[in-house]
Swiss-Prot record:
Gene that this sequence comes from: cm3C
EC number: 6.2.1.-
Organism: Cordyceps militaris (strain CM01)
Location of region: SBD2: 424-486
Family per record: Belongs to the ATP-dependent AMP-binding enzyme family.
Name this protein carries in UniProt: Acyl-CoA ligase cm3C
Binding site for ATP: 282-290, 423-428, 507, 526, 624
Pathway(s) where this gene product acts: Secondary metabolite biosynthesis
Purpose of the protein: Acyl-CoA ligase; part of the gene cluster that mediates the biosynthesis of beauveriolides I and III, cyclodepsipeptides acting as inhibitors of the acyl-CoA:cholesterol acyltransferase. The HR-PKS cm3B initiates the biosynthesis of beauveriolides by iteratively catalyzing the formation of the linear polyketide chain. The ATP-dependent acetyl-CoA ligase cm3D converts the polyketide carboxylic acid to a CoA thioester which id shuttled to the first T domain in the NRPS cm3A by the acetyltransferase cm3C.
PANTHER family: BCDNA.GH02901, LONG-CHAIN-FATTY-ACID--COA LIGASE
Positions of region (SBD1): 353-423
GO MF entries: ATP binding; CoA-ligase activity
Keyword field contains rRNA-binding: no
Biotechnology: Beauveriolides inhibit selectively the acyl-CoA:cholesterol acyl-transferases (ACATs), leading to blocking the synthesis of cholesteryl esters and decreasing the cholesterol concentration, which suggests that beauveriolides are promising as potential lead compounds for antiatherosclerotic agents. Moreover, this activity correlates with inhibitory activities of beauveriolides in the secretion of amyloid-beta-peptide, which suggests that beauveriolides may be an attractive new candidate for the treatment of Alzheimer's disease.
Domain comment (free text): Both substrate-binding domains (SBD1 and SBD2) are involved in the substrate recognition, and are sufficient to confer the substrate specificity.
Amino acid sequence: MVGEPKIVSVWQFPFPIVTGRHLPYCPGNCAAHLNYEIAHQLLFSLSHQPRSRILVNRMIFSSPAWVPSPDQSAPDQVPIGDYVLSNHVLSKNDAPFVDAISGHVYTMAMLRTRVESLARGLAADLNWSPNTGSPEEKVVAIYSLNTVALSGPLLTIMYKIDYFILCWAVHRLNGICMPLHSTCTSAEITSHMITASCTTIFTCSGLMSTCLEAAKELQLPAEKIYTLALPSTYLDNANLEDSPRLKTLEQLADQGSQLPQLEPLRWSAGQGKSQVAFLCSTSGTSGRQKLAMLTHYGIITNLLQMSAFEGFANDTYGQTVAAAIPFSHSYGILIGHVGVLRGESHIVFPRFDMQRMLGSVASYRVNRLYLVPPILAVLGANSFLMEPFDLSSVTSVVTGAAALDRTVAGRLKSLQPSWEFLHAWGLTETCIVVTFTSKHDVWYGSSGSLLPGCQLRLVDAEGKDVENYDQSGEVYYKAPNMFVGYLGDHESTISSFDDDGWMRTGDMGAIQVSPNGVEHLFIRDRIKDMIKVKGMQVIPADVEAAMLTHPAVADVAVIGVPDELAGERAMAFVIRSTSVMSEFSEDDLRDSINDHLEDRLHETHWLGDRLEFVAEIPKSQSGKVLKKILREKAASN
């Protein structure tokens, strides 16, 4: 370090340190106490050596050496809401949630008061008490958008953000929350509520008709259905005049504010490790949705892992963030909780609206965006959408839930040079984030590096551990915060783990070392989506990536279909560009795309006539392609 021209002298200190923000206060650390980023970069370069180790013929990967362990252990006898509301000490910021439509702000004091009032109202209405009855008897489904609006005095509109308040109120009563995606059908709602033995649901006017259809099937009485109101622009198109008059969340909270205090929740030591906080439905991209059980301890552990990883870049604390993510998704659950813990201001949208989101960035001087790759793909292909707005406040864009194409990231980086694209990877079952990208080692195409406390192995098709970099295998995962199983599906739970307690993620991945010498995870594809052509594995993502380099391909999804000679072959569903080669007939464009593909990939990846042009590709809210729907479509043809 002394050989570095910017360094005058070196102060030796124990490593790892908790956060890099302590560096400027080390005497003699940098000439004239230069910005700590210089010291960060030097520290990073000296401590980046991979920490993987070979153990009993297993190559076990862990977090980089420069990532500190969390500075506290996750408590195991505290509900998640109590934890984040009582540990909001990382910033003086006191506006954890801001409604994007109205600008209404919830302070920490308001959050605590409203959680307690709502819990009292729920307890009275449902005849629940904190320490009586099992959690499994207190399951509450939430089928709602993120933001609610309530009529106030003199017909004014008071905007409130009650999604997490409702979750924490249920937890205050020792209950379990079951978030349901707004895209759920009435049949899916019915199935989940039967599986969870759930007889209480909260919905909103924008989703009312689907909820009532499910309630009718379940023979659910009206007094077990509660509502969250919405701004008029988000109302359901259905005629709601014939709907039953349902009690609102606001009425419950008002009722509870007049009631005596609840008794404290009494948990025994270790209860948080087994107590389920959320029943989260899996994406269902390859099959039916299942309900993954996530514990209070597991989610709190992940919050601390995320905070420790980003402690290396401490300017994330107290920032303003905007997320186009539904709170019903595990990704949204994590973002909401970590923001409160770290003292961030979270700009909340009822549902995604591109223009409203970009306008909010300018209005609230947003520093970080949480997005999914399909949204970024739209921005990259339509830069004019960003032109009316001042987006200079944004310094980082966090993506997850699906792969971020490196071409899209590079294009957006050229348009917005101040944006760093930080990709993360995880599953609902891993509770929740496993890898994250440091802003000091951004590598497009990767999913980042492992969080502290997380371990990873790669297992090939023959069941042998991968022992080399850049060699693919199924990702096996172990950490203190894995899910505890699928509700009502013992067989799937058992098959998710090997005999040593490693979780099979179902994702195919590889570890590569970045130019800075840091191990990164690259996710190739889902194991279930792999295509076996003449005994050789074909990764659909490889075919998709090659096709996306054709100028006339706007989007594509590839699946495997049966083939009499090869066993399986790749089939592609393509959305064609509206502006490039639009004069081509479908047959001519199909020939052009096939020529393009055959110039780049082996014959096992070729399509032939198995290329279908479609108007849209079915995707989940998080941007994952619903390949089961495409398989059904291919089979019907």
